[in-house]
């Protein structure tokens, strides 16, 4: 969640695979809340995974505080649980995956692809492996 753009991703119903969904322009808080509320009404997620821009040394800086402040407002407004995930290197990982798949920034913007990386990290960590040998 940046100052200008918010990338959104969505999981499949089995919570196995995350896919980029949309990029929202970050206007004023009211308009941004309305746009996110529309996505939540359409897709009906159980919770929101929000990337937290933790600094490279692992501390919570001013940008992370801004994200947390807006996320708390979002949680109250939508009555939905928020889970924070470290978003360090998510854009780099998204760009690498886009390059590996032959997609470029004109096909999928970094913001939505990075959101999918963050969500996929959460899914991989919270879901047990589907198939055991």
Swiss-Prot record:
Signal sequence coordinates: none
Subcellular location: Cytoplasm
Keyword Translocase annotated: no
UniProt keyword annotation of Nuclease present: yes
A GO MF label: nuclease activity
Gene3D superfamilies found in the cross-reference section: YqgF/RNase H-like domain
Gene Ontology cellular-component annotations: cytosol
EC nos: 3.1.-.-
GO BP: any one term: rRNA 5'-end processing
Cystine residue pairs: none
SMART domains documented for this protein: YqgFc (SM00732)
Alphabetized InterPro entries for the sequence: RNaseH-like_sf (IPR012337), YqgF (IPR005227), YqgF/RNaseH-like_dom (IPR006641), YqgF/RNaseH-like_dom_sf (IPR037027)
Record keywords, A-Z: Cytoplasm, Hydrolase, Nuclease, Ribosome biogenesis
EC class name: hydrolase
Pfam families per the UniProt record, alphabetical: RuvX
Cited function: Could be a nuclease involved in processing of the 5'-end of pre-16S rRNA.
NCBIfam families associated with the record: RNAse_H_YqgF
Family the UniProt entry places it in: Belongs to the YqgF nuclease family.
Protein name in UniProt: Putative pre-16S rRNA nuclease
Origin species: Dehalococcoides mccartyi (strain CBDB1)
Classification of source organism: Bacteria, Bacillati, Chloroflexota, Dehalococcoidia, Dehalococcoidales
